[in-house]
């Protein structure tokens, strides 16, 4: 796809995510998202803002990552995953109360929580000292995803 249309917004967004999420080449990925976002005809810029926000936060640039995730929501208020990633960003930044607020918004928007959702909810609850809520997330994770990497991470810390 790249060799056919190297300026394609969709191709650049997808390649940027591949660089960031699969290869760990986070800094390099940001240029690809910028190319995608520079295309005024790109029908889903909210996805590029979302991806760039996650990758920027992985560089420890939390304020910029937060701004990008909020741009994702502004571009498409129905794009539910952005609130989850804002919760994760705030958690990684050490702001558990803000993480909890974003996670509750996210939780109200989804029908069923994934293993990753439950782990994040558990982490936030633990950090907030909400042990009953943390136990509920753990119970759901054990019941619904007994062989998941997320449960392993919860129980072993790895």
Please place each PLM-identified region on the residue numbering.
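Structural signature of tandem alpha-helical TPR/SEL1-like repeats
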Residues: 23-35, 59-71, 94-101, 132-136
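Structural marker of alpha-solenoid helical repeat scaffolds
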Residues: 4-5, 39-41, 75, 108-110, ...
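Terminal, low-structured helical/coil segments at or just beyond the last alpha-helical repeat
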Residues: 105-158
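Canonical positions in the second alpha-helix
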Residues: 1, 35-38, 71-72, 105-107, ...
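Canonical tetratricopeptide repeat
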Residues: 14-15, 51, 85, 120
